[in-house]
Structure formats: structure tokens, C-alpha cells
Amino acid sequence: MIILKLGGSVITRKDSEEPAIDRDNLERIASEIGNASPSSLMIVHGAGSFGHPFAGEYRIGSEIENEEDLRRRRFGFALTQNWVKKLNSHVCDALLAEGIPAVSMQPSAFIRAHAGRISHADISLIRSYLEEGMVPVVYGDVVLDSDRRLKFSVISGDQLINHFSLRLMPERVILGTDVDGVYTRNPKKHPDARLLDVIGSLDDLESLDGTLNTDVTGGMVGKIRELLLLAEKGVESEIINAAVPGNIERALLGEEVRGTRITGKH
């Protein structure tokens, strides 16, 4: 079984002031998934411009200040949930158009958190869909949080990858982003940035100048932290550039693709 993450920065126009799909990328990636046709696949996608602006504006996941703030957060939670659900519909539409039996799974309907971390997730349906040859599609979402100071949390696609991988133990985990992997510096701003072929610990990140793209789910360093937790349990992953035509298809077929592997201590 393969778990494939599609970054929000690839399938949406993340810097857009309004939620916007990157339709060219989304349809091409869906076509590549259809061409590769892996025997067992689960897809996790980020929220991009459909989630981060709203979660940030309403400070979902930070401590609630007073009753008025709580009322505002409730609305922000519902608004964010609605927008990311719309993105998921676009993703499933693109997959279905390629003949892929994509089944939408709304995280806020079966996941709860405590202090921003997943505390409960009933994955029995996901297992059943996989056994039936379906492709479950989950996504970064907002969920209820049992920490009374927060009440609501953002659960990133990367945290979902970590959680589901530990419980489903896939053979491979592939993360498609908008860069070739993890660099020593932001490659979009620094031509001399060097690609890291392997990361085995957070010590390997000391040369990074912060995150590549800071957002409410932690940016690139947040992604790597999640993947290192996963690697410690024996599930390695690879970060590749999903914006490069053919990369997703080759990765799903098991072919070598330029990128960064996240391993245990090395």
C-alpha cells in the first residue's frame, strides 16, 4: 500500500487572496495517478489557499481569549471546514475523471485532537475502503480539540500522514510538494541552495534558514518533524516535486525520482 500526499501548494494557488485551484497541476497529477494505477493507494492532500488563510485569520488552534473570541472562532472553524471540503470535492472530481475510485473522507467527521495532536481517529472505514480496492482521500482540516483552552485545532496533511502511516504501515510514503525536496535554503530565493538527499534527524536541518514557507501547519520544518517521527517507527518517506510532469507517476511506479528521503538515524 502507498500513501501519497499532494501538497496544497501544488494543487492550489496558495498565494492567491481567494481560494483558487491550480487546475493544470491537479488534472495532470490525477492523470499520472491513473496511469500508474497502484494496487492499493490512499491520498492525503493539503488545504492550500482553501484552508490556511481562514485558519490563520481566525487563529484556529491558538488559545481562546474570551467569550467573544470563542464565538468568532466557532464561525472561523465552520468557514474553514466548508472551504477545505470544497477543495476535496475538486480533488475527487479530478480523480474520478481518470477512472480512479476516489472516496472522500472528511477528517473533522472522524478525528478528534488534544492540544493540536490527533487523539482519536476511527480508521476502520479507511481500512474497509482499501480492502475493497477504493482510494480513500483525506485532507488537512479543522477538528474539535479536547483542550479547553483551544477547543479547535488545525490538523495538517502531514500530521495525517504520520498518524495513518503508523497505523496502516504502508510500504511507501510519497510527499509531492512544489520543490524538489528539502534544501539548505529556500531554492526559490537562493540559487546556491543545495538539495539534501537524505535527512536522518533534526540536526540535519541546522543549516536551514527557517522554514521554506511558514504557514499555520508549520511549513517545511513542520513536515520534516512529522516524517522523522514516522521514520523512528520504521516507515521511511520521500519528498519529491509534484509540479514536475511525470514525477508522481514515476514515484508511484517505484522508479527513482530526484528528491529527499526521510530516514531514521543514519
From Swiss-Prot:
Record GO biological process? terpenoid biosynthetic process
Citing just one GO molecular function, the answer is: isopentenyl phosphate kinase activity
State if ATP-binding is listed as a keyword.
yes
UniProtKB keywords? ATP-binding, Isoprene biosynthesis, Kinase, Nucleotide-binding, Transferase
Q: Does the keyword Kinase apply?
A: yes
User: Which residues are recorded as binding substrate?
Assistant: 47, 52, 157
Q: Which residues bind ATP?
A: 5-9, 48, 178, 183-188, 219, 223
Note the site residues: Transition state stabilizer: 14
* Pfam families for this protein: AA_kinase (PF00696)
EC number annotated for this UniProt entry? 2.7.4.26
**What's a single GO CC term here?**
cytosol
Top enzyme class of this protein? transferase
**pH-linked activity:** Optimum pH is 6.8-9.7.
Alphabetical list of InterPro entries matching this protein: AceGlu_kinase-like_sf (IPR036393), Asp/Glu/Uridylate_kinase (IPR001048), Fosfomycin_R_FomA-type (IPR024192)
Q: Which reaction does it catalyse?
A: isopentenyl phosphate + ATP = isopentenyl diphosphate + ADP
Provide the family line: Belongs to the isopentenyl phosphate kinase family.
On assembly, the entry states: Homodimer.
Report the function annotation for this chain.
Catalyzes the formation of isopentenyl diphosphate (IPP), the building block of all isoprenoids. Has lower activity with dimethylallyl phosphate (DMAP) and isopentenyl thiolophosphate (ISP). Has low activity with 1-butyl phosphate (BP) and 3-buten-1-yl phosphate (BEP). Has no significant activity with geranyl phosphate (in vitro).
Q: What is this protein called?
A: Isopentenyl phosphate kinase
Q: Which organism is it from?
A: Methanothermobacter thermautotrophicus (strain ATCC 29096 / DSM 1053 / JCM 10044 / NBRC 100330 / Delta H) (Methanobacterium thermoautotrophicum)
